[in-house]
Amino acid sequence: MGDIIELEGHLTVDGKKFCLLLSRFNSFITERLLEGAIDCIVRHGGKREDITVARVPGAFELPLVAQKAAKSGKYDGIVCLGAVIRGSTPHFDYVSSEVTKGVASISLAYDMPIGFGVLTTDTVEQAIDRAGTKAGNKGWEATISVIEMINLLDGM
């Protein structure tokens, strides 16, 4: 028996193009997620001119624009950023579920790494914590996952 082949994505960006999709709803949170995503790309060797930011009205619109970006062939990776905060109606459940399913299906359909940086929280405080304060920045975390997956898929 031969040696085992191990594949692992590296955390470097070399000439890769990114599309960052940002929900404008809850922008006081999502703009912080965007800052984290851009910082992550730049700190890992990416150039600001290789980043496209597209703003959509709300999280529900993210899958459609992610599909358009994936279909365009212009990008190596996509990161979806948003904040869905639970209210007193079932709207939260419908939106968070459909956004999650939509983003996952597009990633699979186009063999495209898509980072899921959509916060789904019970409170505004939880969202703020995850947008760069107590619980890190989920925009950064979604982006580092995309960087790793781009490099892993390139090696396959």
UniProtKB/Swiss-Prot annotation:
Keyword Zinc-finger: no
Gene this chain is encoded by: ribH
Gene Ontology MF: a single term: 6,7-dimethyl-8-ribityllumazine synthase activity
Natural source organism: Magnetococcus marinus (strain ATCC BAA-1437 / JCM 17883 / MC-1)
Pathway noted in the entry: Cofactor biosynthesis; riboflavin biosynthesis; riboflavin from 2-hydroxy-3-oxobutyl phosphate and 5-amino-6-(D-ribitylamino)uracil: step 1/2
Record-linked NCBIfam families: lumazine-synth, PRK00061.1-4
Residues binding (2S)-2-hydroxy-3-oxobutyl phosphate, per UniProt: 88-89, 130
Keyword Transferase annotated: yes
Name of the protein this chain belongs to: 6,7-dimethyl-8-ribityllumazine synthase
Classification via SUPFAM superfamilies: Lumazine synthase
Active site location: 91 (proton donor)
